[in-house]
Structure formats: structure tokens, C-alpha cells
Amino acid sequence: MKLDVKSVSAGYGGKLVLDGVDLTVPEGGILTLVGANGSGKSTLLKVIGRLLEPRAGEIVLDGRAIRSYGTTELARKMAILPQLHHAAGEITVGELVGYGRFPHRRGFGQLSADDRAVVDETLKLTRLEPFRNRPVGTLSGGERQRAWIAMTLAQQPRFLLLDEPTTFLDVRCQFDIIELVCDLNRRLGITVLMVLHDLNLAARCSDILVTLKERKIRHIGTPAEILRPEILRDIFGI
């Protein structure tokens, strides 16, 4: 399944943040967007995830413009976890993960046997079985982020979009989340597209790094190709 960004421009109000961006996301890998604050990383992720309408250009998923997909149809192929997300504190981890089954459910009834099986397997994959009946509000920051990632996985998407999944976490939890993402990519073959600020974390797990600056994509390559002094000076001024 192929994902292409074709000549996309996007912004907010009178401000243009992306200008004519083109990108092909390789299937089955981990691609990470990096760049300075305000470079358009999260904006590009939102456009791909259909949370923001582009001003020009289009996103093409599996040979079809993403705007042609119905909400449920798209949710079976792509899941996005924004940087900020909230749930009522009394909701249990198991219930939160069950919400991820919405594209596969009929109506608003109880989870089917198939749904429950997917929830069970997802809790195992994300090492959350012991927390199934714990209210989300009682979890640590790292545990809570794993629960949200588990909810997106319960959609059984082919593409997983993560906007700064390590934000507000301590160093240990940041590494735990990145290792979880790497493990899910290897086990499930799911394509991951994410935004990260930390270059060490990005280098640790990414197959491809994409740098953004001045509304454009500036570089695309492996971590070894991108994390070179001249490129870091260009993108970050360091």
C-alpha cells in the first residue's frame, strides 16, 4: 500500500506553512519528520491524516485521493495519534483500547468476539495486560501513552501516524515508547510516519529521516546520510 504526498501546500489563516511538498512514504518502514519548531512537521502529518485540508495538492493512498475515502474506510487503513489527546480519567485501559475498534464495529453495541480478541492481542503487544482494568487517569505518563498507541493499533491500520509521541515524558519513558514503536513496526509490518524533535531518538528507530525548513522538504535519507554536520547546520543552525 503506497502513500504519496503530491505538491501539497497548507497553512493556518493567512500563514503558509507548507509550499508544494512532495513525498513518498515507503511501505513497511519508519519515516520520521524532523526540523526546527514551526518548520511544518506537524502540519504535514495533519494533512496526511486528514485533520487539515490542504490549500493545494493532494494525498494519494493506495492509488486514490485520500479525500475520496469515507471516515470508516480510511480509519481501517490509517490511524493518527495527535500530540495532545484526552480521555475521561475513569475510562479503563481496556475500554480505551476497545474504542479503537470503531471502524470495524456495527452500530454502538457491545464489542464482538473478534473485537475482544483484537483488544486482547493489542494489550499483549503493548505490554498493557496488567493494566486492563486500571483507569487511564491513574497511569504514569509513559503507561498512558502506551495505552493511546494501543488504541490506534486496535484499528488494525496499515499506516500509523504519531505526532511527537515522546512529548512530556522522562528520558526512560521516551526510549520505552520508541522501542515499542520499533517493535510494532517489526512484528506487524505497519508503516510508521512520525514527528520527533529528539534527533537521537529519531536516529535510533528510523529507516528514513525527512528534514523540513522554510515550508519545504530539504533532505531525505537514512539517519547516517542526514545526521551530518553540514545538514544539521542547515536545518537547526548547530
Predicted regions and their residues:
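The feature captures the beta-strand-to-loop junction immediately N-terminal to the Walker
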Residues: 34-36
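Helix-to-loop junction immediately C-terminal to a conserved catalytic motif
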Residues: 49
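Conserved ABC transporter NBD signature motif
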Residues: 57-65, 74
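Conserved ABC ATPase "signature" region
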Residues: 98, 113-131
